[in-house]
Design a protein with these regions (language model features):
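Mature, well-folded catalytic/scaffold domains that follow N-terminal targeting or propeptide regions
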Residues: 1-422
Length: 422
């Protein structure tokens, strides 16, 4: 059985085992293309936003942030400020990849008649004309037409026009949870190369299926479009918005969406995926979603936050998730990080919270990795937000937009609130 088939038939243990076997035997880009192909077949039956490509993006970034690994990552990632020990990072990277495959098998999938389409004609118009037609097709809710133009734009070696146009459209009305921007931005950063024909086509079908439902039929008043979509915009610094970003992490909202939205804005701003005035537009929407004034530095004092608002206690421990490499990760944490790991997994939230102000600089990589493990190796295999939020918060800390102590506190509180049994 192939990994793709295991995911679509709901074979959770099989999917985790197969992806584990592929490591070191297959090209990393092929592994990620297959996983994105499976993600594109996710049918979200309860809400309006499928999270399969969002969690794929988050786990891919988690693995990158844990350090280089040529068996799993196609390119060497930027050096992280928090360098995780190799004897922890490597099994944790593998376990995260296995957790992703497990999740993609656990979620709902389209029946073949209603899922992604592969036989779509593409027209050879100019790129600028194709970009305009792509936009108009989305606004007219004509998915197959939009897909045809997306395939044309995406077939470039560097599909910058597709990435930037999609991000701009997604920014117009991100909704009260930020989904409208979070999902397309996550998907576009994980778009497989057109060399992987079927995954490439399926992922763009998944994207256009979403955009025609979420993008406004008319551009909102006051929204500016960059007239140079053929190149990335200059990076935008968010250093002046640290209080808003930190507030989004403290007031993280339902399932952590405020923090996730903030991180996707920060990533798009840093990469130049959106222009500075689009960043401002998105930050304004984030502020509206939070619903409160940004907190001051004094209000965000970690000691005050711990005293002011206690975290949620567990009634019982969440179910553990067994993966080919989960045992190695747990064993490392029990043997080498017992103090932190035991406190994190205690039923009472305050047991770990009270040590956060005293965590030394050298221990932050362990705390971060332990929270990655806590989010991924516990709970339900269908759960996604616990992982997505954990990665988002630590990514903001990596960028220097929030303190490590705030990241650790709020990830811990979110996991205590939302990690459940199977």
């Amino acid at each position: 059985m192939t990994l793709f088939k295991a995911c679509l038939t709901g074979d959770e243990p099989g999917a985790a085992s197969l992806v584990s076997e592929m490591v070191s035997k297959s090209q990393p880009s092929a592994i990620w293309a297959i996983l994105m192909h499976a993600a594109a077949w996710n049918e979200q039956r309860d809400f309006d936003t499928p999270h399969s490509t969002i969690i794929t993006h988050s786990i891919h970034r988690m693995i990158q942030e844990l350090g280089p690994n040529s068996d799993i990552l196609a390119t060497k990632p930027p050096s992280s400020k928090l360098k995780t020990p190799n004897d922890l990072s490597e099994p944790l990277q593998k376990a995260l990849l296995e957790r992703l495959a497990l999740h993609l098998a656990a979620i709902d999938h389209w029946v073949s008649e209603r899922g992604p389409r592969y036989n779509v004609d593409t027209r050879l118009d100019s790129l600028d004309m194709t970009m305009g037609n792509y936009t108009q097709s989305i606004r007219k809710q004509a998915q197959m037409s939009a897909l045809s133009f997306a395939l044309r734009l995406g077939s470039r070696e560097d599909p910058v026009r597709l990435r930037r146009t999609t991000a701009s459209l997604a920014a117009e009305d991100p909704d009260s949870l930020g989904h409208g921007f979070i999902m397309p931005m996550s998907l576009m950063t994980e778009l497989p190369s057109s060399d992987y024909k079927l995954p490439f086509q399926a992922v763009l079908w998944h994207l256009t299926d979403y955009l025609v439902r979420k993008v406004p039929q008319k551009q909102p008043d006051g929204f500016k479009i960059d007239d140079q979509m053929d190149r990335m915009a200059p990076p935008t610094s968010l250093s002046k918005h640290k209080s808003l970003i930190a507030t989004s992490i403290f007031e993280y909202g339902v399932l952590g969406h405020n923090g996730i939205f903030a991180q996707r804005i920060a990533a798009a701003a840093k990469s130049g995926l959106v222009h500075s005035y689009t960043v401002d537009w998105l930050l304004d929407r984030l502020h509206q979603n939070i619903g409160t004034k940004p907190l001051t530095t004094q209000q965000l004092s970690i000691e005050k936050l711990i005293r002011k608002k206690p975290g949620t206690n567990w009634d019982q421990l969440p179910s553990g998730i067994d993966l080919p490499n989960s045992g190695k990760v747990r064993l490392w944490l029990v043997k080498s990080a017992t103090d932190y790991w035991d406190k994190m997994m205690d039923l009472e939230a305050g047991v770990f919270e009270e040590v956060i102000p005293d965590i030394s600089k050298k221990d932050w990589p362990i705390v971060k990795a332990a929270q990655y493990a806590m989010s991924a190796l516990n709970g339900a295999s269908r759960a996604s937000h616990v992982i997505i939020f954990t990665q988002a918060v630590w990514s903001l800390a990596e960028q220097g937009l929030i303190d490590n102590s705030l990241a650790a506190l709020q990830v811990h509180r979110m996991l205590k609130q939302y990690l459940k049994g199977r």
